[in-house]
Swiss-Prot record:
Protein name from the UniProt record: GTPase Der
Gene name, Swiss-Prot/TrEMBL: der
Secretion signal, residue range per the UniProt entry: none
Positions contributing to GTP 1 binding: 8-15, 58-62, 123-126
Family membership: Belongs to the TRAFAC class TrmE-Era-EngA-EngB-Septin-like GTPase superfamily. EngA (Der) GTPase family.
Source species of the chain: Thermodesulfovibrio yellowstonii (strain ATCC 51303 / DSM 11347 / YP87)
Any GO BP: ribosome biogenesis
Function according to Swiss-Prot or TrEMBL: GTPase that plays an essential role in the late steps of ribosome biogenesis.
KH-like domain: residues covered: 365-448
GO MF, one example: ribosome binding
Matches recorded under InterPro entries: G_ENGA (IPR031166), GTP-bd (IPR006073), GTPase_Der (IPR016484), KH_dom-like (IPR032859), KH_dom-like_a/b (IPR015946), P-loop_NTPase (IPR027417), Small_GTP-bd (IPR005225)
């Protein structure tokens, strides 16, 4: 698909323009704010205008190589260069309020060396009265500048027209229509989520470093396994909610936005992969993240990462420890399979995909009403249970939805149904109809 990459210095408005271009309902698709450098990872989205579709790529702030100060900036620059190499069209976004700076001129020089098609776009021209700001930018070496405002939308239609003119008249591929399985990778900061994604993709799509919290935006990437495509979502590490109640600083503010983006990623997903640190075990925050997945009735795979750091002679004992730990601390997602993996060594990572396929097959499975009531007839119809002095009788059951499989059970007294009754029915459904790894949603209704 035709790919447009937005490049520019930190805080020139790249993410704001990106969000406007993809018209996303997810208003924080890319984290935006007044703080410089809040986009550290690459964001991908699909824009559709005038029956034309194209990929839009929002990059981190571009800066000359000689100004690199740390490992994070070095990795950011590598990501941007990779995105530029995949581009069909580059938007060099400039800031009219700050004016033309030496870094803009150096960036323009480097972009010209790529030989790619470039649009020179001057942002923060909120209305025609600000047009005089653009004249200094002609010295960058172009005959055409496009004045816009990512916030107000001034000049935006003209920019879209310019982009559409450059898209070949070929049938676009709609990523959403491909109906790819959507997989959210979730977990606490620094448990290895991005390393896992990078290993599955075979290239560095995300910043990976020993510094906790280096992924702040959710990132979508397509992974292919034996010809089948999966949409992988790497979320920012989810921290304790109490963490976000502290006094707001720049870092905490951005992390708070990232927290809610992570929740949105779980909402988007079909299956969530919860990454747990093998050295730290299952902690309270892991339980809370699993609880979010369970509440939303998403498929779940638990990955015990950093298995390479467990001494070989202790791994059997450690595996048994995690089996017991999952039963004890994650009892509410007892249907979820788990794997011990090493993102660094790429050990057992490919076992994820058969599990995803099985979960998705079960997740969309439909059981006929006749089969369900045959089960009830055999197991429950004549069974009368007591609950606090009340007689509870099950009449019949029907499946009303898939993704997740949702069943409605009709009883004589809805108030008498307790959680252990629901777990009993769930166990029957799982054993009889082979819902091994998928969540099941059971609703109780009183027969009138």
């Amino acid at each position: 698909m035709f790919t447009v990459v937005i490049v520019g210095r930190p805080n020139v408005g790249k993410s704001t323009l990106f969000n406007r271009m993809i018209k996303s309902d997810e208003k924080i698709k890319a984290i935006t704010d007044k703080f410089p450098g809040v986009t550290r990872d690459i964001n991908y989205g699909v824009a559709k205008w005038d029956d034309k579709e194209f990929i839009v790529v929002d990059t981190g702030g571009f800066f000359p190589e000689e100004k690199i100060e740390d490992i994070i900036q070095k990795q950011m620059l590598e990501q941007i260069e990779m995105a530029i190499s995949d581009a069909d069209l580059i938007i060099h976004l400039l800031d009219s309020k700050e004016g033309l700076l030496p870094d803009d001129i150096e960036t323009a020089r480097q972009l010209r060396q790529t030989g790619k098609d470039i649009l020179w776009v001057v942002n923060k021209i909120d209305d025609p009265s600000k047009l005089s700001r653009i004249y200094d930018f002609y010295s960058i070496g172009t005959e055409e500048l496009i004045p816009i405002s990512g916030i107000t939308g001034y000049g935006f239609d003209e920019l879209i027209d310019k982009i559409i003119e450059k898209i070949p008249d070929t049938q676009p591929v709609n990523l959403e229509q491909q109906n790819l399985p959507k997989i959210a990778v979730v977990g606490r900061p620094n448990v290895g989520k991005s390393t896992i994604i990078n290993a599955l993709l075979g290239k560095k799509r995300m910043i990976v470093s020993p510094i906790p919290g280096t992924t702040r935006d959710t990132i979508d990437a397509i992974c292919t396994y034996y010809g089948k495509k999966y949409l992988l979502i790497d979320t920012a590490g989810i921290k304790r909610l109490s963490y976000y109640k502290k006094e707001i600083s720049q870092e905490i503010y951005v992390e708070r936005l990232a927290y809610f983006k992570a929740l949105r990623s779980i909402e988007r997903a079909d299956v969530a992969i919860l990454v747990i640190d093998a050295l730290e075990g299952i902690v309270n925050q892991d339980q809370k993240i699993a609880g979010i997945v369970a509440e939303q009735k998403k498929g779940l795979i638990i990955l015990i990462n950093k298995w390479d750091l467990i001494p070989a002679n202790e791994r059997d004992k450690k595996a048994k420890f995690f089996t017991d730990e999952i039963k004890h601390k994650l009892w509410f997602v007892d249907y979820a399979p788990y794997l011990t993996v090493s993102a660094i060594d790429k050990t057992r990572l490919t076992k994820i995909f058969p599990l995803i396929d099985q979960i998705l097959e079960e997740y969309s499975k439909r059981v006929s009403t006749s089969e369900l009531n045959r089960l009830f007839s055999e197991k429950l119809k004549d069974v009368i249970m007591s609950s606090h002095g009340k007689e509870l009788k099950f009449y019949y059951i029907t499946q009303v939805n898939v993704a997740p499989p949702t069943f409605v059970v009709f009883v004589n007294d809805q108030s008498a149904v307790k959680q252990h009754h629901i777990k009993f029915i769930e166990k029957l459904l799982r054993e009889t109809f082979h819902f091994k790894f998928s969540p099941i949603n059971i609703k109780i209704k009183q027969r009138k």
